[in-house]
Amino acid sequence: MVQRSKSSANWLREHFNDPFVKQAQKDGYRSRASYKLLEIQEKDRLIRPGMSVIDLGAAPGGWSQVTSRLIGGQGRLIASDILEMDSIPDVTFIQGDFTQDEVLQQILQAVGDSHVDLVISDMAPNMSGTPAVDMPRAMFLCELALDLATRVLKPGGDFLIKIFQGEGFDMYLKDVRSKFDKVQMRKPSSSRDRSREQYLLGKGFKGA
């Protein structure tokens, strides 16, 4: 218990001293994660006015805020998370466990017959600190997100997902490369140095 309290205190200290946390509060973003997407956007120009986008693992809404602003009123954004998320204007939010078929069907129903231009995912499982447990959970979410992307993306569409280096990564990378014309890795400066997270970007979906 003492160790946990010490760890929690260290996290809180790091959190409140984090310049991106302070900047998010100043800019009105719900989380520091907004700057990860903004940095990737600055480099890759993924999000454009009028696009249709799916945001997985959306809560508390940092990526949805950025995306909604960039796609504008003519765009369409469907966001989903197992956690609650305060509403964002013009964003369709589906709360539920993405690994459950019922929630997946709700997302597919919201997409309808018109496919989307971009699928983004900042999903991560609750980490136990044990890689042998955490990596399979993380890769399972990545695999489900890729499966959804291949069902809803237009040919030429793009896919951005948080991923962790470890067991299963190389096979997943190979799978994404088979489905997209170009695959790149991104590590935004706003991603903490000690974090093993990276972002995998697949551009130019080859079609189902």
UniProtKB/Swiss-Prot annotation:
Q: Name one GO molecular function term.
A: rRNA (uridine-2'-O-)-methyltransferase activity
Any idea which UniProt keywords this protein has? Cytoplasm, Methyltransferase, rRNA processing, S-adenosyl-L-methionine, Transferase
Q: What EC number(s) does this enzyme carry?
A: 2.1.1.166
Origin, by domain of life?
A: Bacteria
Q: Provide the residue positions that the database annotates as binding S-adenosyl-L-methionine.
A: 61, 63, 81, 97, 122
Its GO CC terms are: cytoplasm
- Give compartment(s): Cytoplasm
Enzyme category, top tier: transferase
The job of this chain, per UniProt, is described as: Specifically methylates the uridine in position 2552 of 23S rRNA at the 2'-O position of the ribose in the fully assembled 50S ribosomal subunit.
**Protein name, UniProt field:** Ribosomal RNA large subunit methyltransferase E
Q: Which gene encodes it?
A: rlmE
